[in-house]
Amino acid sequence: MRNHDCPTVRFFKARVYKEKETQMTQTKKAKVRNLIIAAMLTALGILIPMMMPVKLIIGPASFTLAAHVPVMAAMFFSPLMTAFVALGTTLGFMISIPVPTIWLRALMHLPVMTVGAYVLKKYPEFVHQKVKIQIFNFILGIFHAGLETLVVYAFYSLGFANIEQGALLNFLLLIALGGLVHSMIDFNLALGLGNVLSKAFPIDIFDKAKNLVNKKKVKAEI
């Protein structure tokens, strides 16, 4: 004998199906949105080194204001987007500045910023905690500047270019200290930009942080 669902069961099945369909549509829209944002940030990452007027070049070292902002902004979306934009910004430096050590330094954004994006994904609440986000910023800056210093040291130590020992030491100190300050300034620019834009547009890490804050408020009220 064939079983027929009662109207109530059919209603709930239709409702569940509609909710699943809505979730799938939202997921597809989010993927398309993130792809567009990744492309825009990558374009900015290429243009900033080429067009930014605030740029300091000392020998083989280069410090361009806001050069890290696109890849750091991508950290507030996902590790995958961060990696994609990091490669794009490296291309930007390769096009605009014909200095191999600068290319290598730019390439170091790939591991450092991607790991940073994973940390923010795990602890999204950091973006609303002023002390913790600056501690994160400082640690990120240390690894960022440290890895860039290490790769430049390896470049000269392996004989790809010649430089006097004293000049090399000064150069490495410049990259380490200047890179740390540069990284922290650019991260705060990216954080401020993300904080403002999150009020008008969905940004993954800021949305997760907001949800966590709301859950804590509900628990506190209970």
Swiss-Prot record:
Specify the protein's topology with respect to the membrane: Multi-pass membrane protein
Superkingdom is Bacteria
* TM helices/strands, residue ranges: 34-54, 72-94, 101-120, 135-155, 167-187
The GO terms describing molecular function are: ATPase-coupled transmembrane transporter activity
Location of the protein in the cell: Cell membrane
Keywords noted in UniProt:
Cell membrane, Membrane, Transmembrane, Transmembrane helix, Transport
GO cellular component annotations of the record: plasma membrane
Primary location recorded for the protein, binned into one broad class: membrane
Please state which protein family the record places this protein in.
Belongs to the vitamin uptake transporter (VUT/ECF) (TC 2.A.88) family.
Q: What does this protein do?
A: Probably a niacin-binding protein that interacts with the energy-coupling factor (ECF) ABC-transporter complex. Unlike classic ABC transporters this ECF transporter provides the energy necessary to transport a number of different substrates. The substrates themselves are bound by transmembrane, not extracytoplasmic soluble proteins. Uptake of niacin into proteosomes containing EcfA1A2T and Niax has been demonstrated. Uptake requires hydrolyzable Mg-ATP and is substrate-specific; NiaX-containing proteosomes did not transport riboflavin.
Q: How does it assemble?
A: In L.lactis forms a stable complex with EcfA, EcfA' and EcfT. In E.coli forms a stable energy-coupling factor (ECF) transporter complex composed of 2 membrane-embedded substrate-binding proteins (S component), 2 ATP-binding proteins (A and A' components) and 2 transmembrane proteins (T component), probably with a stoichiometry of 2:1:1:2. May be able to interact with more than 1 S component at a time.
* Designated name of the protein: Niacin transporter NiaX
Task: Please name the source species.
Answer: Lactococcus lactis subsp. cremoris (strain MG1363)
